Amino acid sequence: MRKISCIILDDEPLAVALLENYTSKIAQLHVALATTDVFQVVDYLQNNKVDLIFIDIQMPEISGIQMMEMFNKDSHFIITSAYPNYALKSYEFRVVDYVLKPISFDKFHKAVTKFLDFSIEATTTALFVKAEGKQVRLNPNEIYFIEGLSDYI
């Protein structure tokens, strides 16, 4: 399975450390950058792409909303914020989930699972087979056995 590259951006060093700890417990995640420095993320994203960004909303230099406006077409976001009042605005972007601080591993894991389910769905190709005179769409991930019958599968 392909690793999901991600960035952790929060102006609180303890929040960055907590999220780094949580990401290390999920095998599919690879942290490309974890920082409190917004400009380091901007520089990184000008030359690199990541799948997922864990981002705080209220930061001193550039807000999380401004960051999402800048990089919305390239990445998905999981917002980690102490303030619920930005939730509605944030869904104008590619936000997978809005997780309120303090963040438990359970809440974090649910948000990541939501992204993983979404990314698997988006990359899964459909398989069409003829059954009972019509075309039926199948998800290849749901096929466990195939039986051959003469010249047919």
Question: Where are the predicted features?
Answer:
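Non-catalytic signal-transmission and effector/linker regions of two-component phosphorelay proteins
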Residues: 1-5
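Cofactor-binding loop segments of dinucleotide-utilizing enzymes, especially the Rossmann-like FAD-
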Residues: 11, 82, 148
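Two-component/phosphorelay signaling modules centered on CheY-like receiver
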Residues: 12-33, 70
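CheY-like receiver
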Residues: 14, 25, 38-122
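Conserved RecA-like P-loop NTPase ATPase core
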Residues: 19, 87, 143
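Conserved binding/recognition cores within well-folded domains
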Residues: 113-153
